[in-house]
Amino acid sequence: MNVCHVYLRLHLIWKKRGSVMKSAFIGMALAVLLPASVAFAGPCVDAKSAKNGFILARPGIKSEFRPVAGEMTSVTNTYESQSPQKQFLFAGLIEVFRDSDTGRLAMIPFSDLRKLFPLKTGARSTIEFVELSPDKQPKATTTLTLVVKGKETFSLGDCKYNVLAVNETFKNGAGETLDAFTALYSPDLQAALARRYDEGTSAQSVNGYETIKPLSE
């Protein structure tokens, strides 16, 4: 029953029986219309619909994910407190290009990233790459070590996704750690839904997205 039909039926009943019945029938109308509105809520983005793009968001940031050629994912990040940023991520996980008002950076790997996917629990890989920037000459290479630790689930609103806990460690040419975190990576969406820092310590924290919707909405 759509909204128009409900309205017409209520109007005829009110006209015949007067205002005494209005409160009761308003409650009936809400009972009919509320399930209908819930039914119109869009389904969760899955592996198939993710190919058309989707938006991940949390307070302060909105990220638009668009699959493109070469197994790359184009990501446009819009922030409340800083300028937008554009990224290209291989398989939605490994960053190979970044562009914003603060500069442009390309990460050129020396190995075939396609051989790393699909990721499997227990897999360990080390990637060497060079960072290229128009304003800075590279003095050394950087390494990224990926360790797939296991499977978990992660929720975005009412949508729940199977994710892989992927430990990422970046080191410079001298072997010093530049950054380390655990990415909660969804193979279906080809996107990292969250990052876990200082894992296993009292300072452990999770920085993740909170909602998801199709890009077309």
Spans of features found by a protein language model:
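Short, Lys/Arg-enriched N-terminal segments with co-localized hydrophobic residues
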Residues: C4-V20
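Bacterial N-terminal signal peptides that target proteins for export
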Residues: S19-M28
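Cleavable N-terminal signal peptides
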Residues: M28-A29, A39
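Predominantly extracellular/secreted and cell-surface proteins with exposed
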Residues: V96-K139
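Acidic, serine/threonine-rich low-complexity disordered tracts
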Residues: G42-R98, V130-E217
